[in-house]
């Protein structure tokens, strides 16, 4: 345990107390690097993260951009992934919305892969919900600890859907994981997590849990030079495209940000209350996912429509579908043909190989 004061972290905490979001970026960087390399005490780390949250400094695009760049500088590199495909996509939410819905981003990623997109999802176990993306895939038999930056290239050569378990890619985050859990507050790491996929991403959907964060994350993506990106937030604070009502979206493309509101009618689908798409345990969600991918859910089933909406949006932002409604048709074909289920089964099998 660190018993001495860390001057960089103490200075940053002082800056946050005095000027909040106007903290000098060089002081912020020095403090974050000290924390990530284990040179700060748990109390200093907790104080720093809480100060970022309470002063809303964590919602400043320049600070978010710098955080992403610093974390990626410590991440495990992945070589030659562009030889597999130059157009990988991802769909992920920040989490922490409190609605505890079915793992729609994971299901949508699989359906999109069945439709022909190269999808490498980057995620973790649940922190606030009943079932995170990693929990769900592990319940389906995927050995995520066997999927590493060293073998992900060979895995993606064999299947269009793959998943990188975040702790395998960002070893320095182990220094803050227990502190984040004990702190009980959302931290800056919740916001930047969806931006840390080590696979170069051509197109993506990122869900945020507060409407005020939509433009913040969109501006951060713009500063990072990200490709086609759609930031989404359901009007009720859902970090996905909502099946219950309006969803605010911010499209980042060609150096601009365009705001638009989607509704279930935009997809030519029915609306459903969030209670009808609630999450179960990881094992229960795995059973439901298999039923979905086996084309066993009836037309207009809430979970099916929820997945179709989010998949269609990913297909649209990636350029595979010219419209949201065309995206729905492509997603339906991915499920009914069995292609989506084959992608998941293939990844599960390959992930278990020595």
From Swiss-Prot:
Q: Enumerate the catalysed reactions.
A: N-(5-phospho-beta-D-ribosyl)anthranilate + diphosphate = 5-phospho-alpha-D-ribose 1-diphosphate + anthranilate
Q: Which residues cross the membrane?
A: none
Q: Which domain of life is it from?
A: Eukaryota
Pathway entry = Amino-acid biosynthesis; L-tryptophan biosynthesis; L-tryptophan from chorismate: step 2/5
- NCBIfam families, alphabetized: trpD
What protein family is recorded? Belongs to the anthranilate phosphoribosyltransferase family.
Q: What is the official name of this protein in its record?
A: Anthranilate phosphoribosyltransferase
- Protein species of origin: Schizosaccharomyces pombe (strain 972 / ATCC 24843)
Taxonomy of origin reads:
Eukaryota, Fungi, Dikarya, Ascomycota, Taphrinomycotina
């Amino acid at each position: 345990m660190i018993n001495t004061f860390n001057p960089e972290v103490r200075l940053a905490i002082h800056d946050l107390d005095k000027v909040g979001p106007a903290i000098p970026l060089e002081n912020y960087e020095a403090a974050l690097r000290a924390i990530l390399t284990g040179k700060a005490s748990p109390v200093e780390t907790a104080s720093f993260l809480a100060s970022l949250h309470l002063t809303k400094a964590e919602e400043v695009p320049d600070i978010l951009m710098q955080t992403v760049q610093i974390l990626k500088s410590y991440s495990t590199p992945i070589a030659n992934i562009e030889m597999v495909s130059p157009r990988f996509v991802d769909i992920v939410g920040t989490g922490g919305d409190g609605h505890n819905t079915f793992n729609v981003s994971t299901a949508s990623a699989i359906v999109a892969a069945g439709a022909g997109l190269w999808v490498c999802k980057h995620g973790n176990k649940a922190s606030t919900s009943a079932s995170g993306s990693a929990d769900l895939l592990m319940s389906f038999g995927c050995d995520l600890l066997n999927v590493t930056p060293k073998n992900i290239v060979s895995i993606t050569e064999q299947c269009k859907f793959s998943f990188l378990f975040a702790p395998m890619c960002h070893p320095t985050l182990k220094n803050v994981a227990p502190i984040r859990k004990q702190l009980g507050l959302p931290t800056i790491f919740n916001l930047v997590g969806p931006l840390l996929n080590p696979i170069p991403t051509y197109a993506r959907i990122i869900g945020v849990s507060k409407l005020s964060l939509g433009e913040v994350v969109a501006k951060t993506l713009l500063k990072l030079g990200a490709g086609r990106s759609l930031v989404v937030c359901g009007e009720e604070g859902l970090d996905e495209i909502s099946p219950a009502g309006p969803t605010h979206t911010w499209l980042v493309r060609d150096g601009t940000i365009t705001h638009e509101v989607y509704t279930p009618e935009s997809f030519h689908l029915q609306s459903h209350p969030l209670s009808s798409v609630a999450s179960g345990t990881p094992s229960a969600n795995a059973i439901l996912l298999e039923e979905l991918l086996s084309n066993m859910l009836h037309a207009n089933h809430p979970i099916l429509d929820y997945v179709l909406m989010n998949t269609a949006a990913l297909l649209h932002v990636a350029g595979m579908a010219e419209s949201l409604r065309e995206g729905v048709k492509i997603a339906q074909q991915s499920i009914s043909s069995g292609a989506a289920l084959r992608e998941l089964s293939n990844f599960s099998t390959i992930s278990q190989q020595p």
